[in-house]
Amino acid sequence: MSMTDVLSAEDIKKAIGAFAAADSFDHKKFFQMVGLKKKNPDEVKKVFHILDKDKSGFIEEDELGSILKGFSSDARDLSAKETKTLLAAGDKDGDGKIGVEEFSTLVAES
């Protein structure tokens, strides 16, 4: 499964372009722009599993740093600051990683 099975390639391209500048990433705006906010819970979970590159059931800090590449291979990596901000927003139980339910909540709060 690829990201374009769930989200529009055009929406992904626009969202990646909007956050091309270093330290410009805003997960709330990004999730809205790619159309993830409008998706049903099962589709949000599909996106989570695509982003969970090592299939551990969690998106760890290193995977968060390359989250944009999960949407488009030519996207940039997040800065350390952006990664930590995203982790802090999504890691509700403080275990240092984002599980599927935490990801679903993060998207819903966007």
Swiss-Prot record:
Ca(2+) 2 binds at residues 91, 93, 95, 97, 102. SMART domains: EFh (SM00054). Keywords: Acetylation, Calcium, Metal-binding, Muscle protein, Phosphoprotein, Repeat. GO terms for molecular function: calcium ion binding. GO terms for cellular component: axon; cytoplasm; cytosol; synapse. The modification N-acetylserine is found at residue 2. Residues 39-74, 78-110 form the EF-hand domain. Expressed in the modiolar nerve root (at protein level). The modification Phosphoserine is found at residues 2, 8, 24. Ca(2+) 1 binds at residues 52, 54, 56, 58, 60, 63. It comes from the Eukaryota. Belongs to the parvalbumin family. In muscle, parvalbumin is thought to be involved in relaxation after contraction. It binds two calcium ions. AB domain, comprising of helices A and B, is involved in structural stabilization, protecting the hydrophobic core of the protein. It is required for high-affinity binding of Ca(2+) and for Mg(2+)-binding. PANTHER family: PARVALBUMIN ALPHA. This is Parvalbumin alpha. It comes from Mus musculus.
